[in-house]
Amino acid sequence: MKRKLDANDVPSPEAADKKEKKEEDDADFESLNLDPRLRQALIKEKFTKPTLVQAKAIPLALEGKDILARAKTGSGKTAAYVLPILQTILQKKATDPSFKATTGLILVPTRELAEQVQNVVTTFAAFCGKDVRSVNLTQKVSDAVQRTMLADYPDLVVSTPARVVTNLGSSALSLENLTHLVIDEADLVLSYGYEEDINALAKAIPRGVQTFLMSATLTDEVDTLKGLFCRSPVTLKLEDKDDQGAGVSQFVVRCAEDEKFLLTYVIFKLQLIKGKVIIFVDDVDRCYRVKLFLEQFGIKSCVLNSELPINSRIHVVQEFNKGVYDILIAADEQEVIGARKSKKSKETEEAGSSDEDEGEPEDKSKRRKVSGKEKDYGISRGIDFQNVACVLNFDLPSTSKSYTHRIGRTGRAGKTGMALSFVIPKDQHGKHRPTSTATSKHDESVLAKIVKRQGKLGHEVKPYHFEMKQVEAFRYRMTDALRAVTRLAVQEARAREIRQELIKSEKLKRHFEENPEELRQLRHDDELRSARVQPHLKHIPEYLMPAKGKKGLSSGDVGFVSFRKQNENRIRKAREKNRGKGNGRKFAGVKKKVDPLKTFNRGRK
């Protein structure tokens, strides 16, 4: 395109944003001068062009500069710091092949994210042979095994801060030769209760270490980490306008508390949503209540929460990404419980922070303590869920910030997605006690902040209207199913699931590396069978079906239908069969004849 001439017939300078965009379009991995083995891994994984954060961060990282980058989850932040670290390790090994030391440390807030980062490192180091070794310290292994893993000085260590401090205390891990430090999801590390561990690490890490702070938001916690670890960092505030949720259609439904279950049943039974769905709920109990409710109608789903063993949680995410399961019910516990905050951040909040990011204050009596199990669990941030068609906020989050992170699980990598949220009007709160939650009291005020925040990003949260006349026809079936899902049934389901997953977790750890075929036998969406299942609820009578939905759910060829039930006289037939064998029921007052020619036992006189 020709540029306009000014008064002196000189072409006007090219606009800065256009120039920047042109540079981004021209950028490729070849221009980054990476090691051929890394480029080979990129080609294998079909990485053609670097994302915005990769194009900006990798050249700066290769120059040795500290980096503070803000970019949304799914923008390629992991590769932006893994590739420069691997490049430096390979260069060091090229000059000194016998060099052995831990030179890279990657800190993450959760075990799930640690496993994900470890997989990325393994993928990019696939062609590096024995030149690059990495260890994930969050794996459930004994201290003796972990000490053995660290004794060989792995080049790269991926861990939560707590595990690093533990191994430093036992002298199993040495950071004397550390050259790279990464804190991924930096805004979560302090809020997840790692403040003491971070302060201990700040004293143990040598000076002059190159630091990467990666975060989706720049908060007070990130500023604290910046002061502890960084030396004049380059700050990258990257907002790819093409990737800021533009592909996510956002809808909200105002409904009563029990109608959440009714609408969920209708959505899945009539297949109103095609593809994979993540259902976000408040806590673990809610997780199993929704799962047991869906089981009543023969709808399979799997759960993800902090109570499950780490191997099982990782396996659930992997299988969900492969398309083995279509419905994942996730307990967003950290968001509901309230992250543990430092004294400084508490004072900042009390002074008054942006109303966009703050939820409604929760009564102290209703807050639960965060257990050690929950400390390193998080699902709405960092985890790379693939090809998610819809995010269903069964329970609305308490902040607009959390809402943004939840809906970020869909519409990733240029694809489209949908976010549907259930909102309880204030006058409906507490009217159906069995399904009521404390957080729904503030749904309307939180929704107002969500709409405001999304409006600033140029997105609209639209109301979604169901044809309630048709939906109401299903209410009696929903009521029957919900009545069967009692509090006792939920508790039994939790205990049963944990027992099953513990067994599976051990097998995953010890056995399945040698027998990968048997992985198919492990299903996380099996029925829990703790609630009374009513078989008739699994089928929809034709008179309940909406006119438009009949074709999609029924085929023209009905096939053979027997006049009588196949199992009609099952018990009677079994009884008759056993009676023929001499095992039948003995009726009171009736003596059985004894043939003296067949037995030596004489009957009583």
UniProtKB/Swiss-Prot annotation:
A motif (Q motif) lies at residues 27-55. The keyword Nucleotidyltransferase does not apply. Its EC number is 3.6.4.13. ATP binds at residues 71-78. GO terms for biological process: maturation of LSU-rRNA from tricistronic rRNA transcript (SSU-rRNA, 5.8S rRNA, LSU-rRNA). InterPro entries: DEAD/DEAH_box_helicase_dom, DEAD_box_RNA_helicase, Helicase_ATP-bd, Helicase_C-like, P-loop_NTPase, RNA_helicase_DEAD_Q_motif. It catalyses: ATP + H2O = ADP + phosphate + H(+). Residues 58-236 form the Helicase ATP-binding domain. Residues 350-361 have a biased composition (Acidic residues). GO terms for cellular component: cytosol; nucleolus. Gene3D superfamilies: P-loop containing nucleotide triphosphate hydrolases (3.40.50.300). It is found in: Nucleus, Nucleolus. Residues 1-30, 339-373, 564-605 are annotated as: Disordered. The keyword rRNA processing applies. ATP-binding RNA helicase involved in the biogenesis of 60S ribosomal subunits and is required for the normal formation of 25S and 5.8S rRNAs. The Q motif is unique to and characteristic of the DEAD box family of RNA helicases and controls ATP binding and hydrolysis. Belongs to the DEAD box helicase family. DDX56/DBP9 subfamily. This is ATP-dependent RNA helicase dbp9. It comes from Aspergillus oryzae (strain ATCC 42149 / RIB 40) (Yellow koji mold). The gene is dbp9.
